[in-house]
Amino acid sequence: MIPSTRYHGSKRKLLVDLRQSFAGRPIGRALDLYSGSGSVTLLLRLLGWQTDANDYLPYNQNTAALFLGTVAQNLPSTEEVSNELGSLLRARHIEPALVSLHFSGIYFTDQENSEIDSFCQQSAHLTADRRRLYIYLIGQALLMKRPFGLFHRHNLNLRIGAVKRSFGNKTTWDAPILQHALTALTELRRVSWPTNAQGTALCRNTRHGFLEFAQYDLVYLDPPYLGQNGATDYADGYHFLTGLLDYTAFGRFDRRRRHRPILNLPSRWHDPASAAGELIEIEAKWPDAVIVLSYRSDGLLAIADLKALLSRHGRTCQQKTIEYHYTHAQTTTHEIILTSTPPVDMNLDILGATVHDGLAKNNRNDFREL
């Protein structure tokens, strides 16, 4: 079972369809270029691919590193995490307490801000593996406590104010951080983790190009959505989680904006022309790789244009359409999966495909409930 998340745009509900798109090929090296929630990174690993992941947000890199590095029998017990993480959250924080000082009344209550300060200050002394796990757990807990699961607005009042609500779950919002963290741990424990760690989690902004990336047999793309109302700015929506990894970032916020973002990262997926240019560079960087792209049908980048970009240089591009309703979307749209195959891949190694199918069958329990 792949862990659930409140991360927007997560492909967790589409993993069965993506698994079919990855199947029937000799397994090799795979890259999840915009890893986000890490769901597809973990899927590829469980299917037997030697997987690397990349994302320009530090918290997402941390998630990918956890999903690539966790091995069977390596997770601490619920009791151990409850005791240790509870102590970190309750510890007396040291001044200046940056979250309490700069974010009072914006995202969380004063008590919750104090717990975040304590965790960030104390977690610096943990081992790398334990700190990676706890940052993931606390991040998931904070997402559960946020209206819309985002940090894009100064809107604590939606959670605690005496106002009429047509969305959200106040009981979930008001539950303790530790309680939500333990729920996230329970989901991690349900994964049938492989016995060996593998892969690398990168934190690169792809607007700077791809020189530092290795070669891969499969490249999966789930880029930010660019719709009629503008681009999805993940840095603006999830900036706060960066402070869990770099506590000093809480003191470097944008004072001009009410929600005080601590991260502002440009992306070529904020503009149709530059996004198309990035796709061209991706195809040029990995000419021999199968490229799988998932995207919404109602984006400013038309599906026909995406197919054309992924059909250059003799490539064959196949389309799969899935009806899907996105959280907070006004209408039901379609998720499109494009699979771009290079000419040399037209004659698939039957033996390799058989090996891949066998590995996928061995992991079938992980996808019984998605």
Residue ranges and their predicted role:
Residues 18, 30-44, 53-58, 212-233, ...:
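Conserved proline-anchored active-site loop of SAM-dependent methyltransferases
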Residues 303-359:
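Class I S-adenosyl-L-methionine
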Residues 64-125:
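Conserved phosphoryl-transfer catalytic core
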Residues 1-31, 39-47, 61-63, 70:
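S-adenosyl-L-methionine
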Residues 229-277:
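Flexible internal linker/loop segments at domain or repeat junctions
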Residues 107-233, 250-260:
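SAM-dependent nucleic-acid methyltransferase catalytic core
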Residues 264-314:
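Conserved Class I SAM-dependent methyltransferase catalytic core
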